[in-house]
Curated annotation (Swiss-Prot):
Organism of derivation: Methylibium petroleiphilum (strain ATCC BAA-1232 / LMG 22953 / PM1)
BP GO annotations: trans-translation
Gene assigned in the entry: smpB
Domain of life: Bacteria
Keywords tagged on the record: Cytoplasm, RNA-binding
Gene Ontology terms, MF aspect: RNA binding
Protein name: SsrA-binding protein
InterPro entries given in the database record: SmpB, SsrA-bd_prot, SsrA-bd_prot_CS
Length: 155
């Protein structure tokens, strides 16, 4: 079950490969995520010293958060993956045009995981083409529903 989806990622990028990564979170962040107070749209993944970090993922703290903890909504979160997977990602990201973007957050075995994708940015004409295809699929579905639901007139 997805907690939060980054719908803009699929529109702005061409997804090449998907990976699953664990996240290092604080207690107040887990509570806020369970309450649905998370936003991924501005998030991106960077590589520093052979480690992956999720930047721009906004987790809004709950009002009931403890007073001795000072929550930061835009805190950088470390992502956990196997070393060989990270090395492979670093090699791909160093190629021109590739980037790492978060696709969604979900639960797996009671833990919060992030799906990240190796992606290439789309050009403006690619975005327009995607929009045209989506509109055509929607229109086609409406036509088929209308055709099936209306009775046939034979005279």
């Amino acid at each position: 079950m997805a907690i939060a989806d980054n719908k803009k990622a699929r529109f702005n990028y061409t997804i090449e490969e998907q990976f699953e990564a664990g996240m290092v979170l604080e207690g107040w962040e887990v509570k806020a995520i369970r309450a649905g107070q998370v936003q991924l749209t501005d998030g991106y993944v960077v590589v520093k010293d052979g480690e992956l970090f999720l930047i721009g993922c906004r987790i809004n703290p709950l009002r009931t958060a403890s007073t001795h903890v000072h929550p930061q909504a835009d805190r950088t979160k470390k992502l956990l993956m196997k070393k060989d997977e990270i090395r492979r990602l670093v090699g791909k990201v160093e190629q021109k045009g590739y980037t790492l973007v978060p696709l969604n957050l979900h639960y797996k075995g009671g833990r919060v995981k992030a799906d990240i994708a190796l992606a290439k940015g789309k050009d403006l004409h690619d975005k327009r083409e995607t929009e045209k295809k989506r509109d055509w699929e929607r229109e086609k579905g409406q036509l088929m529903r209308h055709k099936i639901s209306s009775p046939r007139k034979d005279t």
